[in-house]
From Swiss-Prot:
This is Protein A37.5 homolog. It comes from the Viruses. Belongs to the orthopoxviruses A37.5 protein family.
Length: 62
């Protein structure tokens, strides 16, 4: 659980830092770059073990 929490915070920070805000992410959803960031946000919301979630988000929009 600790590992997942760290991963959650890390990805959340990365996602927020790159997209700037939820509005930006939604507005530029058409761009491939933002699509990738959207996946980052997705994993943070999806509950489960870090291993499973990490693998899942990698193939979400691959």
């Amino acid at each position: 659980m600790d590992s997942f929490s760290s991963l959650f915070m890390k990805l959340c920070c990365i996602s927020t830092d790159k997209t700037g805000s939820k509005k930006s992410d939604r507005k530029n959803k058409n761009k491939i770059k933002d699509y990738m960031e959207h996946d980052y946000y997705k994993i943070t919301i999806v509950p489960g073990s870090s291993s499973t979630s990490t693998s899942s988000w990698y193939y979400t929009h691959a």
